[in-house]
Amino acid sequence: MARAGSCGGAAAGAGRPEPWELSLEEVLKAYEQPLNEEQAWAVCFQGCRGLRGSPGRRLRDTGDLLLRGDGSVGAREPEAAEPATMVVPLASSEAQTVQSLGFAIYRALDWGLDESEERELSPQLERLIDLMANNDSEDSGCGAADEGYGGPEEEEEAEGVPRSVRTFAQAMRLCAARLTDPRGAQAHYQAVCRALFVETLELRAFLARVREAKEMLQKLREDEPHLETPRAELDSLGHTDWARLWVQLMRELRRGVKLKKVQEQEFNPLPTEFQLTPFEMLMQDIRARNYKLRKVMVDGDIPPRVKKDAHELILDFIRSRPPLKQVSERRLRPLPPKQRSLHEKILEEIKQERRLRPVRGEGWAARGFGSLPCILNACSGDAKSTSCINLSVTDAGGSAQRPRPRVLLKAPTLAEMEEMNTSEEEESPCGEVTLKRDRSFSEHDLAQLRSEVASGLQSATHPPGGTEPPRPRAGSAHVWRPGSRDQGTCPASVSDPSHPLLSNRGSSGDRPEASMTPDAKHLWLEFSHPVESLALTVEEVMDVRRVLVKAEMEKFLQNKELFSSLKKGKICCCCRAKFPLFSWPPSCLFCKRAVCTSCSIKMKMPSKKFGHIPVYTLGFESPQRVSAAKTAPIQRRDIFQSLQGPQWQSVEEAFPHIYSHGCVLKDVCSECTSFVADVVRSSRKSVDVLNTTPRRSRQTQSLYIPNTRTLDFK
């Protein structure tokens, strides 16, 4: 069994773990005062309960009684006993052990008093100690008496007041008899011993902190020389005073301080409660809110703010407000008109249909309709390659007028209209006018127009009698009049004053139909509209080129290795040169295939979307590596040398309104370069021809194109 330190507060001050048992002498030295009566009753009861198992144990002094943390009391082992202050004969019976326990409790009650002083005890406690300490005299007196006579002793024992206490059971019975409920004596006295043990440890820890604080203050003094004070002097400095104050504080906390008045309960004669320490009792009351706050008086009265709780104040405020109207009686104000944002206005304008320009009069209805807005191909001797159709010439051989069917065309986009308006505003009255085709007019629409015109020509041979054709709408169909440089190569319908159509325009609103020659019908049936002859955009050329490249790639399907290399971009699409492993070759803009630097050329185009760039505005940078690429094929060198002219490099000057936002350079392979160059040449020639068309024929645009009366092919 471990021993506790002999010096009070040494364990707590030295930082060692708290002991789990203390001797009665250590408790007395810590408090510097004797035990109270309640603690004496508890030590007697718990001591008898702990010593029942060893009746021959000898208690020589208060140091032999040990108090444990659970409230039990035991005796110290004989071999660990210290030198006794009073010599006691060896105990050989339970009666002598009870007697030694009585002497120890008496010394604990009389500890610290002078010999001349005597402590006043309660009659019950004084009688118990007297019976325990004088049991040997009672024993000897009983032996001298007559053995056969035991009447008075039996009478006293029958009355419940024994003449001597010789056993532990008798002492425990007397300790329990003083309580109102003797059955709870064990729990009560165990709680008292536990409280005594815990309070002693707290007092020792408090005294250790006081001693450390004093030592700290002495070290902080700089004006006085540092003098080493003996440890005993520091320990004894104010020890008694601090211990007395501690005991008074514990007594006040246990008896006098109450946060809330306890309701009346059953009468309990116990003066104090020892189940918990004062600190534990205070914390338990705070947690359980067993307290009642005093009301604060202001001018002799409680303020109105604290008369009611918050919930009642809120309800009073709600009741004080005017009553709410019923839902059926409420009328909400109309919402103010919401102002539309600029974004919403723009979206509404986009969703609305385009407004057509009104027809100015019947004089405009009598005008002829020009040719379709298509692009002329390079003029050749074959009439099949001609793509310009003159729709303004009347049929001279027609004897009667016939109705002209109308074809619905798609309206141009907003971007196209802006480009056309911008180009018309920047032109001078005498300068050439750059025309742009309606990109929404596709080949399917042209084929449909061709079929309707052909059907109209067939029905014109037997026109109904007396029928008058409907008046045509003035629109954007242009009358094409070629210049002097194109008259020998390109077909045209020249406005002649002697022409019957032109002579009858000013006099009558009807336009007689002209007869169609068999050659014209034959040429119209064999009319073709090649891709390169259209004023395509870059996006349309890219789509066409991708379809052609996809068809060209099908011939490499038999050679899977070559097909895979071309598809994955491991070799050049033109010269079939293999690229290095960690290289990043450029890709062609049109066919999206990898191309080497010797087979590519830089193409110049405006900084716009591909769908808004006409193909005739493209240009090429002069290749600097034509002379260095000696291994290049002759056909590729010819392509590069054919792009040396100034017409490919001065596109910014030729089309300033399109290149106003700058230009970009794109890589194009040699195969796509030859394809695009042919398309650009054809488009530029057609644009040059369309520039000679008078401006008055392009004043307005119509979504309807009437059927032609004469098709002139040469």
UniProtKB/Swiss-Prot annotation:
Membrane topology category: Peripheral membrane protein
GO molecular function, one term: actin binding
Domain of life: Eukaryota
Disulfide bond entries: none
Alphabetical list of CDD domains matching this protein: FYVE_SPIR2, WH2_Spire1-2_r3, WH2_Spire2_r2, WH2_Spire2_r4, WH2_Spire_1-2_r1
Principal localisation: cytoplasm
Modified residues (Phosphoserine): S371, S440, S442, S476
Domain text: Binds to actin monomers via the WH2 domain.
Family listed: Belongs to the spire family.
Name of the protein this chain belongs to: Protein spire homolog 2
GN (gene name): SPIRE2
